[in-house]
């Protein structure tokens, strides 16, 4: 039978995975909507995000209660503190996703074909983000196999690196188009800004992975 510390830590992990599941569903809905440039579907993307702040706050309150009542040992305490940071990052990711979909209002049936093409190319970033979310879920649920945990962190880093490369190619493409047109195109400038902001999501996931490594294996942040 699990002691109270272990029992509550299992609950913290499970609740955190629930939030990550919501974020993953939202990302997949966003991907489907943007693949079709179907702005009518954008509102559906926000539905899984509506309860994330409450869920994150509930996790924080649970952690603080455990720390106050049960005096967890150093290893458990380290993981509890890591999850306080993780829930904060997850709330920011939810905000990033909402803002991203608001910005992607430029993807609609009236958008010019060049904008639609660039947005569809940028969705490779979203696919990397979905993979990183799934790896993060696995990192949280894997509590014993340290090699597997390190491997999952490495996979998240690979996905992060891919998104950097994808953005660099998109930026180069749009700058080349403006050069050929001999003018600054505000739509392209904004599009680069929106796509760059979308990178913050996977950046936060990489930070979460680092915190999980610190909590489970140790080292420095």
Where are the language model's segments positioned?
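Cytosolic, long alpha-helical scaffolding segments
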Residues: 1-221
